[in-house]
Amino acid sequence: MSIKRDKKTVKVITILSGILFFGLVMGIVIFSLPDTKRGKTDKDESVAEAESTTAHIKEETAAPETQKDTEPLAEPPTEPPTEKETEPEPTEPETEEEAISIDLIAFGDNLLHKGIFDWNMMLNGDYRITSAYENIKDMVASADIAVVNQETVIGGIDLGLHDYPRFNAPYDTADVLHELGFDVVTTANNHIYDMGVQGIINQIDYFKNNYPDILLTGTYKTAEERAQIPIFEAKGIKVAFLNYTYGHNRFEKGDVIVNMLDTDQVTADIVRAKEAADFVCVCVHWGEENKKVENEQQQALAQLMSDYGADLIIGTHPHVVQNVTVLTGKDGNSTLCYYSLGNLVSLQHTTPTMLGGVAKVTFTKVGDAKAITAFDYDFVVTQWDAMHGGCRVIPWKDYTPELAAEHGMPSFDKTFSYDTLAAIVEKYRLK
């Protein structure tokens, strides 16, 4: 049987079919949406879901446990240093060594004739001849080291006062030298045996027992004392003072040692002294009396001392002043040499013996570097009247024609005058 459909029926069926199809599609879409969009709001279910998610995150991000024997983690790369960071740290500038200087002053022969003591006894009632040196006290005090050659042995009054040719001075002389401020006293000279061995022993003992701060050099009681390098220290600078004599007027055997001018001994001592001190000064009694110019032997000995490293040479014995020169040693070193300082004080009877030389030297040390940085040649005059009275030493700068007119020297030497002395000063002073 066949079914016949008219147009109206077909149209209704078609519309119903479309509605059913649209409903089916919408149902599928809604079912596929998340719960939140589907209106799911149950609180317990939301919290459970959140806790589950948090636990999952913790499991993924938890750091693995490390053990002590595992390899260390590599350091993270650092930023390259900036230009400022690569500059070296500023350092403190090196401190310059401080220069230390000391001044030395040296006088010639302290030649004490008996008349000087007799006059002082008559005026003052004792042998303490302080007034003879009163005018040079400031000169002595101005130096860090003051040196004098004690030409006459200080054997003490018990051995008696003696004049030329065998001198002896009372202990008061040592007292005065200490009072003036002398630091170094040289004793090796041709008059050292004038009072025999006992005179030498007395002199050594008196200085040692009363003035141990004074360096006595040139004579010794034992070989052990002789073996020690005599050194005087001022402001941390050490100066060795070696003292020798060409000979002596008389000799007496005994337990004393006098330094003789033996070249082997001198050079060996200089070498040892250079190891022990900063500077080496050789005080040598040499030359010819009353000779105004050094002789060839003095020149040769001075050059030898320079070759072995002496820094300063101070000569005595001629009783008159001689030249000052600077020598060059074999190693290129410099040596300052005063060939003769003449007399500090005396009652000799010639004009040149009344003028004494004064060595003025500056030693400087900067770290290990050492040098003589300044030197000069000054002068003093021994003043006394016709009776040898009022004997005193006067600095040349204070000497006047009036003082020269009062001097007793014209009674013995008619050439004496202020102008004569001035001519000698002009000849030898450093230009």
In which residue ranges do the predicted regions lie?
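Acidic, metal/ion-coordinating pockets
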Residues: 2-3, 11-40, 49-51, 55-56, ...
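Polyanion-binding surface elements
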Residues: 8
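Glycine-rich, pocket-lining loop/helix-strand segments that form or immediately flank
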Residues: 60
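Extracytoplasmic/periplasmic/luminal assembly and interaction segments
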Residues: 65-84
